[in-house]
């Protein structure tokens, strides 16, 4: 007997796959996706919502009487959405904002790896164009540049 209402946050392929898996679960009666995409609209109810807006997400989850909220993208996790849901007594699948920093900030992840002596590629955090240019000259190609 299906009885669960699930809210999936996000609009990408990962969230589509998560929502579809929930839709196929016989324990799930209703799947909602915020904001969703045209693909998720074929089997779930999409809600136009900024998934990084903690108050809006909590309000929607309460309004839907969601039994579970699944947070797909890293941006809402880093913004503290999972924390806000848990603080409101709503079950949530997703790490805390603090734990999400490992995925959300490459610089933070590099600091953690260095502190734990985990082997990783050399890196440099830069705050302006001059320091980026100096780092590129120092490392030489090939290199990877990421925005944090």
Model-predicted regions and their roles:
Residues 1-98, 130:
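ATP-binding N-terminal substructure of ATP-dependent carboxylate-amine bond-forming enzymes
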């Amino acid at each position: 007997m299906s009885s669960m209402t699930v809210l999936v946050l996000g609009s990408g392929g990962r969230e589509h796959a998560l929502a579809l898996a929930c839709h196929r679960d016989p324990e799930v009666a209703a799947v909602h996706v915020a904001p969703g995409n045209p693909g998720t609209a074929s089997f779930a109810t999409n809600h136009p919502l900024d998934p990084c807006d903690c108050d809006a997400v909590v309000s929607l989850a309460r309004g839907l009487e969601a039994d579970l909220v699944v947070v797909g993208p890293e941006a809402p996790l880093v913004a503290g959405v999972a924390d806000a849901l848990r603080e409101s007594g709503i079950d949530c699948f997703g790490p805390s904002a603090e734990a999400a920093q490992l995925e959300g900030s490459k610089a933070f992840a590099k600091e953690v790896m260095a502190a734990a002596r985990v082997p990783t590629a050399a890196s440099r955090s830069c705050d302006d164009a001059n320091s980026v240019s100096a780092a590129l000259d120092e490392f030489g190609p090939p290199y990877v540049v990421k925005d944090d």
